[in-house]
Design a protein with these regions (language model features):
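Glycine-rich phosphate/pyrophosphate-binding beta-alpha loops
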Residues: 142, 146, 209-224, 287
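Short, solvent-exposed amphipathic alpha-helical segments in soluble enzyme
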Residues: 19-22, 74-75, 154-155, 224-227, ...
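Short glycine-/acidic-enriched loop or helix-start segments at secondary-structure transitions
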Residues: 14, 68-70, 96-98, 150, ...
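Cofactor-binding loop segments of dinucleotide-utilizing enzymes, especially the Rossmann-like FAD-
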Residues: 6-9, 90, 238-240, 307
C-alpha cells in the first residue's frame, strides 16, 4: 500500500484544491491519503502509516514539506526502517527532487507510482544521505551568507532563475555602494566550529554550508562532492571577504567551482557550531531564527523511488 502525505499549503497547491482531489482519485484504493500542515500532524500520520505497514511513502510538496515529513517519520520508524520514498513535488522549491532527477507534475508522478506498485514492477532507487541538524532531518544547511541570500530571494512572491540573477545583481550593487544592503548580505558571524572533532582556527565567518546533495537551491551547485561517500556530508566554511564571496556566488551560478585559499572544503560525518550570538540558519530553504548551538551529523540514508515514465 502507498501512504501519501500532502501539504495543502505547498506552493503549487495552495489555492488549487482540485489538485488534492485529483491526487486522491489517482491513489484510489491503493493506499491512504493524509494532509498535514504541522510537525505534530506529521508525527501522527507517521505513527498511523507505520501501524498500517505501508510499502511506499509518497510526499506531496516541496523541499520544506520533505524536510518536515522526514523529521517526523525518521524518529517514528527508528531511522533505518523507512520504506522507499516517492517525491511528488508540488512545492515552490523542489531542489531535492530536481537533484534526484524527479520531474513532472504531481499527478503524473503519482500515476507512475500507483502503476508500478500495482503491478509489483521494478523501480529505480536512488539512495541519498540525510543531514541531521539538531533534531531535524534535511539535506541542505546554511548559515551566514546562504541565509542572507534566501532572505533576499523571499522578499517578494516572484521566483525562478531570473529572480536569482536579480538577487545576485543586488549583491553586486551592494558591494559597489557599500550601503545597508552590503551589511545585510555580508554580516559575519562569530562562532567556534568543530569538524570531525577538530576545532577550526578562526572565529569570524561569512558562510557555512553543509549538504548531502550537489545543488543547494536557487540554481547553486557548490557541493559537488556531497554524495561522494555514504554517511558523510560536504562541509564548506569560509571567512572570505564580501567581494570574494559575491564573485564566488556568481561563479557557482555559472557552473564553476568555488575558489579561494580561505575556503575549508571537507567531507564530514559530524560538526558542531557554537555561536557567540543568536543567528538564523536555514534547512532546505526554510529559515529558523535565533540559533545558538547547532549540531550537524550524517543522518539515515533514504531510498528514493524513481518510477519510469
Amino acid at each position: 500500500m502507498i501512504g501519501v502525505v500532502s501539504n495543502p499549503r505547498a506552493g503549487k497547491t495552495i489555492g488549487y484544491p482540485a489538485r488534492i482531489n485529483r491526487l486522491k482519485q489517482i491513489l484510489g484504493p491503493h493506499g491512504f491519503f493524509r494532509e498535514a500542515q504541522t510537525l505534530d500532524e506529521m508525527r501522527d500520520i507517521a505513527e498511523e502509516f507505520r501501524k498500517r505497514g505501508i510499502g511506499v511513502l509518497a510526499i506531496h510538496g516541496g523541499d520544506g514539506t520533505l524536510h518536515h515529513a522526514l523529521s517526523a517519520f525518521i524518529p517514528v520508524y527508528g531511522g533505518t526502517d523507512l520504506p522507499p520514498v516517492a517525491l511528488l513535488r508540488g512545492g515552490t522549491m523542489n531542489t531535492i527532487a530536481r537533484c534526484l532527477g524527479i520531474r513532472g507534475l504531481s499527478e503524473t508522478i503519482l500515476k507512475r507510482v500507483v502503476s508500478t506498485v500495482g503491478r509489483q514492477g521494478l523501480f529505480e532507487v536512488v539512495r541519498t544521505n540525510t543531514l541531521k541538524v539538531n533534531d531535524r532531518y534535511g539535506f541542505i544547511f546554511g548559515l551566514g551568507f546562504p541565509v542572507s541570500l534566501l532572505k533576499a530571494y523571499y522578499k517578494d512572491q516572484s521566483r525562478g532563475r531570473l529572480k536569482t540573477i536579480g538577487v545576485l545583481l543586488e549583491i553586486l550593487f551592494s558591494m559597489i555602494q557599500r550601503g545597508a544592503a552590503y551589511n545585510d548580505f555580508f554580516h559575519p558571524f562569530q562562532a567556534d566550529i568543530w569538524v570531525e572533532g577538530e576545532r577550526l582556527p578562526g572565529r569570524s565567518y561569512t558562510a557555512f554550508l553543509g549538504a548531502t546533495v550537489k545543488e543547494v537551491g536557487l540554481g547553486f551547485k557548490p557541493t559537488r562532492r556531497a554524495a561522494a561517500r555514504e554517511g558523510y556530508f560536504q562541509c564548506l566554511c569560509t571567512d572570505m571577504s564580501p567581494e570574494r564571496m559575491g564573485l564566488n556566488a556568481l561563479r557557482v551560478l555559472l557552473g564553476m567551482e568555488l575558489t579561494g585559499e580561505r575556503l575549508i572544503d571537507r567531507l564530514a560525518s559530524r560538526s558542531v557550531i557554537a555561536l557567540e550570538r543568536p543567528s538564523d540558519m536555514q534547512i532546505d530553504g526554510e529559515i529558523f531564527k535565533n540559533q545558538t548551538e547547532i549540531r550537524l551529523s550524517a543522518g539515515p540514508t533514504i531510498s528514493f523511488m524513481r518510477p519510469k515514465a
